[in-house]
């Protein structure tokens, strides 16, 4: 398990006093586990214990989803809260992700994620769960960041950093600071009215993004698929060496 991080509000920077610990991890199977005609499960889901929610993906799954434009693994790699892991793995994987991630696909991911939160949870805006406001606000800020950084595809995960780098209007900054201050002292299910400033920012960024990211997009190139395979093999081989395995294809 070369990487385990916090993926929820504690890493985003807007946790509540009773927020869960959302631990997510990447695991890599031994070389010998690949020499079989049977497909191994690519997800590990642990039972919820208290305020700890933990599950992880096989590196193979993480790479496949990355090449399809899923932003989840990109965010894991940028989490500011690392529970355990190996620095070289995170650094190398993040470098590969920067090259492999499709701006268009990542943009569509954030747009669809944010629009769903807006559509399902905002209602008339008089009483909205605070965390749902952030669940739409964060994708909107990520879309703005992508628009302002036309050569980048990997936005900051940490929300205060994301907001600072996307240079929002001053009235929005004040509203966001107030929201974060309130959420920091309110239980996870606390509610708040949706301000016009926040709603306007969210709707504006989604509207702008529709014109940029709603196209069908292009899948990963053959060259990038080959590079993903090379990266995967390199990780498996290095972990085998570091574990002291002499014959990686001999069962334990």
Model-identified regions with their sequence ranges:
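Short hydrophobic/aromatic segments of transmembrane alpha-helices and their interfaces
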Residues: 6-7, 56
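Conserved nucleotidyltransferase catalytic core and NTase-mimicking acidic/glycine-rich helix/loop elements
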Residues: 91-222
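A basic- and aromatic-enriched beta-loop-alpha substructure that forms the phosphate/nucleotide-
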Residues: 36-115
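Catalytic metal-binding acidic patch
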Residues: 8-49
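Helical scaffold of the NTase/Pol beta-like nucleotidyltransferase catalytic core
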Residues: 1-5
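Short loop/turn segments at secondary-structure transitions that flank enzyme active sites
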Residues: 29-32, 69-72, 116, 142-143
């Amino acid at each position: 398990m070369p990487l385990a991080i916090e993926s929820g509000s504690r890493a985003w920077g807007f946790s509540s006093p009773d927020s869960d610990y959302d631990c997510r991890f990447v695991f890599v199977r031994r070389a010998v586990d690949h020499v079989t005609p049977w497909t191994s499960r690519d997800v590990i889901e642990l039972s919820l214990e208290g305020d700890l929610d933990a599950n992880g993906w096989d590196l193979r799954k993480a790479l496949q989803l990355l090449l399809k434009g899923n932003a989840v693994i990109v965010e894991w790699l940028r989490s500011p809260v690392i529970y355990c892991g190996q620095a070289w793995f995170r650094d190398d994987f993040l470098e590969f992700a920067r090259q492999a991630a499709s701006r268009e696909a990542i943009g569509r991911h954030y747009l669809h994620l944010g629009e769903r939160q807006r559509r399902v949870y905002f209602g008339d805006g008089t009483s909205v769960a605070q965390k749902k406001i952030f669940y739409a606000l964060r994708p909107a800020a990520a879309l703005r960041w992508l628009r302002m950084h036309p050569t980048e595809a990997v936005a900051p995960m940490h929300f205060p950093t994301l907001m600072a780098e996307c240079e929002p209007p001053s009235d929005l900054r004040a509203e966001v600071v107030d929201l974060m201050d309130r959420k920091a002292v309110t239980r996870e299910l606390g509610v708040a009215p949706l301000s016009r400033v926040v709603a306007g920012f969210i709707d504006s960024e989604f509207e702008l993004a529709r014109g940029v990211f709603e196209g069908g997009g292009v899948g990963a190139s053959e060259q990038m698929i080959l590079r993903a395979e090379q990266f995967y093999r390199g990780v498996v081989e290095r972990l085998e060496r570091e574990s002291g395995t002499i014959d990686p294809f001999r069962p334990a």
